[in-house]
């Protein structure tokens, strides 16, 4: 888990850094000009939560991120080794969670030089979003990791429920009345 998590965390932080270094806030770049009406890299500083919702409340989400982080670290060792889907989902959610916490702490630290404390700077903390597909709010690698991880968990739970309803145990063996 930690290899995938660290790779995705690094990818998230590097891509955010590249965007901040090369584009002004609200500036867009079309890496594929023929597709510019469908996809651009657009530099957005998001003080809200996922996909830019609830602006200014990102600090609340950061607290939720910390609870999720602890939950994953506690729950992960309990995931059976054969449940690679759930292990992958946990790694993805952890990477996304950490990516946005690191980003918010980075910007809060920058603002704390003005406000005098990191606590008073937390409401201004933001993450860099940049993937703009025009039909959805701008997002980043962390958002992609969390959404994909949650989708895998939902799919896995649906599959388990379906298997139970069709009379199959999680092992794939037909269920009997004494199971």
Task: Identify the role of each PLM range.
Residues 1-179:
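Alpha-helical transmembrane bundles and membrane-interface segments of multipass inner-membrane proteins
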